[in-house]
């Protein structure tokens, strides 16, 4: 079961930022190693900002409610003050909807799978 560990991304942020700007980042590891937990904390820190990065607007497509853990439309995990969540939305559709209508500075998704997801990333 996934859970929140605030601060678990502290050591990663210096490696994915430069002059308070964010590099494009892909987290890769075997199942069960904590990618989603790490992603959740990265989203929170990117949204709120800190000494490594300015606060940015983040759009999350949470197809299976694993990142935000939404219940009745309310995120149960803390994803930051500048984060919008599309819960239960297919990733490919959600990424395109975010780009077209919400214009986030960062888009975060968990588990890129099929060619539709890749096409949406290229969009």
Q: Where are the model-predicted features located?
A:
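Hydrophobic positions on the alpha1 helix immediately C-terminal to the Walker A/P-loop
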Residues: 38, 42
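Hydrophobic anchor at the beta1->P-loop junction of P-loop NTPases
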Residues: 27
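Conserved lysine of the Walker
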Residues: 35
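The conserved Walker
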Residues: 31
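P-loop NTP-binding catalytic core
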Residues: 1-24
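P-loop NTPase switch/communication element
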Residues: 47-98
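A general structural motif
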Residues: 7-10, 85-93, 112-113
């Amino acid at each position: 079961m996934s859970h929140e560990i605030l601060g678990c991304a502290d050591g990663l942020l210096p490696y994915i930022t430069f002059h308070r700007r964010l590099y494009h980042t892909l987290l890769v590891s075997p199942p069960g190693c904590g990618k989603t937990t790490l992603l959740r904390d990265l989203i929170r820190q990117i949204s709120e900002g800190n000494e490594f990065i300015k606060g940015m607007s983040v759009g999350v497509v949470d197809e299976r409610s694993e990142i935000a853990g939404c219940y009745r439309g309310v995120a149960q995990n803390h994803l930051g003050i500048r984060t919008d969540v599309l819960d239960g939305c297919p990733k490919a559709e959600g990424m395109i909807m975010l780009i077209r209508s919400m214009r986030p500075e960062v888009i975060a998704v968990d588990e890129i799978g099929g060619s539709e997801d890749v096409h949406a990333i290229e969009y």
